[in-house]
Every structure is written in C-alpha cells, then in structure tokens.
C-alpha cells in the first residue's frame, strides 16, 4: 500500500485512455507541482459519487486509476495544461485529510482470476453489437443534426483481450456508471460482460431517441 495524491473527477479514467486536464484550482496546482518533481509524475483519478469537482466536500468511489503525466504546459498564474494517460487500476483503502489536495492510501487492484481469459472469437457478438449501435448513431446524427463519434477502428485495437476491452470501453460513448462497472469488474471475463451490458444500454438510449 502507498499514499498518493488523488484527483476526484466527474468522469472515469480507464487504463490506457488519454485524459487532458486544465489545472486551475490552487490545491491541484500544488498537486501538479509536487508530481512534476517525480521521475514518473502520476496521481490517482477517482469518480465522484456525490458532489462537484471544484471546491471539495465531494463523496468518492473506492476504485480508481493512476494517471501518468506525459505532457504538461505552464500557462501562467500557477495553471497547467496536462496530457495524461491511464495506468493501472487501484483500490482505495483509506482517504487521508486533504493536504491541501486529496490523498489516499491505495494498492494495485490486479484481476482476481488470471484463468478467466477469453478468446478472440468471443468478441464476434460484441463486434456485431457495436456495428449495430453505430448504425443507429448514424441515424440519430441525421435526424437530430448532431456530430456522432467516429466508428471504432477495430484493426487498430490492441491484440490482447484485456487491453481490447479497455480500448473499446474508452471509444464507445457510454455513461459514467457503465464505465465504472467496467473498471470495477474483478476479471477480464466479468469486464467483457460489463462492456456488453454497456453497449446494450447505449443502444437502448439511442433507439429511444429515434422513436417518432
């Protein structure tokens, strides 16, 4: 276990996902200042359960992701523009008093069953569901005159099933609750089930919006 700085957000950061941040609150300016002294500047990102990002007083979940700072720019008055990427999943054992930014005692949360691997062929149904979803999203774009997210590049996805799930979850426009379910799944097989459920949820929302 180790104590690390934490950044509560209104969104879930998934492993491998890129996260741009504009740091303007003084307490998080201090967090970044301290992080940049490290060889591998990083902090934890956790979803806020209740409350708001700014001002403190929020209630937070107990599963999080490390965020590695891969680029930063000081833009004056102590503010920063950061480019971060999600690292490993972590479990929060205890929250410490803010000093001045949130701190937590955390430990890595590895998959609980290394034997629960899945084969590439098990993604066939998932691919079909994603294709159906994006066809519906295209219809929604035409009827509501909105910009739809680009279709995921399946050929560009990682080879391993575990990384493929993280990448797909980051690409599909799902809600934060679904993203949290995927992050909180105990192993790869459960994570794929959570991903499939999330795709169904998004599909149901789009179908509802397409109703006359």
Features from the language model and the residues they span:
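N-terminal low-complexity, acidic/polar interaction/targeting segments
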Residues: 1-212
């Amino acid at each position: 276990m180790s104590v690390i700085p934490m950044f509560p957000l209104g969104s879930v950061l998934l492993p491998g996902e890129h996260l741009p941040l504009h740091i303007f609150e003084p307490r998080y300016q201090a967090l970044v200042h301290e992080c940049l002294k490290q060889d591998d500047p990083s902090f934890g990102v956790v979803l806020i359960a209740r409350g708001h990002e700014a001002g403190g007083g929020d209630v937070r979940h107990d599963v999080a992701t490390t965020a590695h700072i891969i680029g930063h720019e000081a833009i004056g008055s102590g503010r920063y523009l950061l480019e971060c990427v999600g690292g490993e999943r972590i479990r929060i054992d205890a929250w410490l008093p803010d000093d001045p930014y949130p701190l937590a005692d955390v430990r890595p949360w590895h998959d609980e069953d290394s034997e629960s691997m899945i084969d590439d062929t098990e993604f066939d149904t998932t691919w079909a569901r994603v294709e159906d979803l994006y066809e519906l999203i295209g219809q929604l774009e035409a009827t509501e005159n909105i910009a739809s997210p680009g279709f995921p590049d399946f050929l560009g996805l990682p080879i391993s099933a575990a990384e493929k799930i993280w990448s797909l979850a980051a690409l599909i426009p799902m809600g934060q609750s679904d993203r949290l379910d995927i992050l909180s799944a105990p192993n790869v097989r459960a994570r794929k089930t959570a991903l499939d459920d999330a795709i169904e949820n998004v599909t149901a929302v789009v179908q509802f919006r397409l109703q006359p």
